[in-house]
A protein has these predicted regions:
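Substrate-binding/catalytic cleft of secreted carbohydrate-active enzymes
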Residues: 1-216
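Conserved active-site neighborhood of enzyme catalytic/cofactor-binding cores
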Residues: 220-221
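Surface beta-strand/loop "capping" patches
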Residues: 224-238
Length: 238
């Protein structure tokens, strides 16, 4: 489940209107994937806020498969997730996570919360029995991953760090041939020909949507599966 832009409005939250839909989605995923040995953990969703509906999803999944642990990025009280899930932590936050130190929310975190990642405060006692997973890190946009090795070093340094998931694997674009037979990979509003516009009015930000920006094109490989330059850095680190 991901509700991203409307999760602040309690969707799905604890609203009973959404309970049946999100539980059904969870059940269907478990039934589809529970016999695949590569699936080592169930995820209740991503960027969808918090609320009792996620506990209902977990209960439904456990009824079908009680052999796996659970992950949920939006679990603020860690009653649903078996891991501490974070997005895009800075170097100092990585050190606090590795040393199991309390984390408070800064002004920067509050701004980030309005855009995407849910930066959660963490009390020292919440680390007990909960390893740390970066559900998104190393945002692979343009000429990126310059400090990728620093994350790898921290994964190796701290025993409570499981690792993380690079955002993301492949450019999110659709293959279309133009009238001359040339290959094109389209995303955003390429199909409507709209001009890009500011996503949110925060000074010095580049959060944009539209046809001439590249927020969907941030994979370590292209939509045609050809490697981007930063995949060399990933290979070196891993």
């Amino acid at each position: 489940v991901e509700t991203h832009g409307v999760r602040r409005k309690g969707v799905p939250g604890s609203n009973p209107v959404w309970t049946g839909a999100v539980v059904d989605r969870m059940q269907r995923m478990v039934l589809r994937d529970r016999n695949n040995p590569c699936v080592f953990m169930w995820s209740l969703g991503n960027e969808a806020g918090d609320g009792s509906n996620f506990m209902e999803m977990k209960k439904a999944a456990l009824a079908l498969d009680n052999s796996r642990q659970f992950h949920y990025e939006g679990d603020f009280d860690l009653t649903k997730s078996d891991v501490i899930s974070r997005m895009y932590p800075t170097k100092d936050i990585m050190e606090k996570l590795g040393n199991k130190q309390p984390i408070t929310i800064s002004l920067y975190d509050n701004i980030a919360n309005q855009l995407a990642a849910d930066s959660k405060p963490i009390k020292a006692e919440m680390y007990e029995g909960k390893p740390v997973v970066l559900c998104e890190y190393a945002h692979s946009m343009e000429n990126s991953l310059g400090n990728f090795q620093e994350y790898i070093d921290d994964f190796e340094k701290y025993d409570n760090m499981c690792g993380g998931f690079i955002w993301d694997f492949v450019d999110q674009a659709l293959h279309v041939k133009d009238e001359n037979g040339n290959d094109n990979y389209l995303y955003g509003t390429d199909f409507q020909g709209q001009e890009p516009h500011k996503l949110i009015d925060i000074p010095n930000t580049t959060a944009m949507t539209g046809s001439n920006v590249y927020f969907c094109a941030n994979g370590i490989i292209g939509a045609d599966r050809k490697p981007h330059p930063q995949i060399v850095e990933v290979k070196h680190g891993y």
